Amino acid sequence: MEQVKRVYTFGDGKAEGDATMRDLLGGKGANLAEMNKIGVPVPPGFTITTATCNDYYRVGQDAIVAELSDAVAAAIAKTEASMNSKFGDASNPLLVSVRSGARASMPGMMDTILNLGLNDEVAAGLSAKTGNPHFVYDSYRRFVQMYGDVVLGMKPENKEDIDPFEAIIEEVKAVRGIHLDKDLTVEELKDLVERFKAAIKKQTGHDFPTDPHEQLWGAICAVFRSWMNERAILYRKMESIPDEWGTAVNVQAMVFGNMGETSATGVCFSRDAGSGENLFNGEYLVNAQGEDVVAGIRTPQQITKIGSQRWAERAGISEEERAAKFPSMEEAMPEIYKELDSLQHKLEQHYRDMQDMEFTVQEGKLWFLQTRNGKRTGTAMVKIAMDLLHEGLIDEKTAIERCEPNKLDELLHPVFNKRALAGAKEITRGLPASPGAACGQIVFHADDAEEWHAAGKKVVMVRIETSPEDLAGMAAAEGILTARGGMTSHAAVVARGMGKCCVSGAGGIIVDYKERTVKIEGLTLKEGDFISLNGTTGCVYAGEIPTEAAELSGDFAELMDLCAKYSRLQVRTNADTPQDALVAAKFGAVGIGLCRTEHMFFEPEKIVAMREMILSETAEGREKALEKILPYQKADFLGIFRAMDGKPVNVRLLDPPLHEFVPHDQAGQEEMAKAMGVTVEYIRQRVNSLVEANPMLGHRGCRLGNTYPEITAMQTRAILGAAVELKKEGLDPHPEIMVPLTGILYEFESQEKVIRDTAAKLFAEEGVSVDFKVGTMIEIPRAALTADRIATRAEYFSFGTNDLTQMTFGYSRDDIASFLPVYLEKKILKVDPFQVLDQKGVGQLIRMAVEKGRSVRPELKCGICGEHGGEPSSVKFCHRVGLDYVSCSPFRVPIARLAAAQAAVEEVK
């Protein structure tokens, strides 16, 4: 392999990297280097690059280890010099941590090992040097536990079992009658080390390595391997993080939070990650190591006094008891707190964003182990962006870029109905780890959560604590409840990042995985029982509580105003009812981009008349039935035009094949026979005659209108009749009539003539006319290829990207699920093309159609109305190819508006 620099060192206020090198050094490595340079105390160490991770998978472990060995040895020597100790030396040992660090934050998804370098001789030497054997053997048993899990694969044998190491610890504590790990004696800790080693040998067949250099290479390679573990792959898929980015490996001198009562470890945030409030907050544990906080093994205490008081109030603990038993760091370690507060402020000012920081206090000295832009809820994301804008730390364009479009979805999630909540039975309280309202059936294991979710059930996952292996279950659940863990535990951090409701550290619950029960204050709930969680307050309720729409904040409105200021691309909505139209208008939709007329026919009184029209064999019979349908259609359009007064409403003429409307069951056919005064056999024969081998490519869209022009005429009268009536009332309707599934100019011309002839007749009858446009959906590849011809008649194009994707790929939307998972797994496809617009294929047809159409009609309006209209990357593509608008479901409107603004900001850059 070509010799490239693979190892970058940092320490003593110097670093070979900086914050701009996150692609190469990963987020953690780049920030460790940057913190060194700006005077934040960071233990020395080195970073192995993300490119090395990719080469690890390309050329194999042996080749990478051989190439890295000299550079790693030199970096270890540099770290030894900084710490005045020696790696593997029994009398003056250097211990290190080995951590992952991708360029995008992936909390808990990859592996970490602490206290590396310990063996029996080093432990004895370190005990003699420090005079603190309890700290040494506590660190040693932690190291064996982590290494056994991460490197040697020591896992629970089945999902009902707890961690095998924890099982041994619990057994030892039970014999002694103690509850906390820190109460274990030195002899018990030594015994745990030996029992852990024996358990590893028995379960894995591997001896625990005693050579520190062998330990180091085992850990480095394990971190590289963890890039491709199941949970990391799933997380990358959820967060759209490319596999080819790879992870860096950070090797850093250990500092110890478990050296006694003047030592501690913690995680803190420069602002509240749940609400966005400008309030420094976090959690710490005295005499502990960092993984204790993140893993949720012990429920920690608050860093700030105000945070501690809020926690005590929620937990029902008096101020006197709180101050005595659960003091904040601000009270218990005031000097350390003052330094921590000063440095967190410095880091936020430097990075100009909310920071998530990890730190350790070793015998009264503060060290920072990492900083990163913190994961946050959708609510916090918007508030923090607006607050930083007001504080002058960022400008308007940066505020727009700081917000992730898909996370706006969280702000629109329902909350518990206030009246129902007032009468609900609260059964316990925990920490409000991630806001929102969640209700579902209890499950205890991640695979069960996935299975129940796939069966259409809503579930709440209840765990003692979550681990990264639970990620898929957390994604499937409505919410998460844990017995252990704080506001910075794995469950809390991941839930906030996913926008999932979470209540953590509910100490009043007892979870029994084998019995599949949870006992809460004397109440026993079983798997399948309903439970409700309020992640904003930490309250847990028995049973189901109904929800209602959330109220949107002033910060949200301000962000939407910024989006309007910078966007060129407009956002409409897909809406078939006045209610949907009003919701979308509230979110800022400038019109309706797709109103589907067929959805209006499925109400009981309408479907009979519709079926009568379809099942009639003569034009006279169809027209008679259409006369019954006309007032229903007109009434529907009156409501929608009224809701969208002054805004364009694009109505698609009847599109689906007729067989979708007719009764296929015996009872339905008997009902129609009675209504039409014909035999059941006649109805059955007519229904059978409508069945097609490939209905999506059959008698539908404009083909229906051209074979049954009376349908188009009726719909035109309903649309324009409603517009005329509202104009007489003084309103300002803007109807647009869209011909679906056009592939040939003559198909469109034929339908346009019916529409315009019907309009002229209607306007003459009413003595009033309204302006309207006639356009077409571009959803057949031939229409895109001949768009210049179609644009000679069509006044606008609306790209139906669902069907255009279907016909371009030759994939059936209804059947793609049979092979899509395999295609995604094998990377034949990177994403589902029905979810994310295929820019290289379908996108080029759109680009071509826009260019061809505007070559003959420069003022041609173009938009899209498929599901892609609310997907951020697709919206940005639509901006780049010059579309005028996108249209999406009402609750995706804010997401599309933000994506459109970001596209405009990115274009200027």
Per-region residue spans from a language model:
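Long, charged amphipathic helices and adjacent flexible linkers at domain junctions
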Residues: 238, 400-452, 458-459, 527, ...
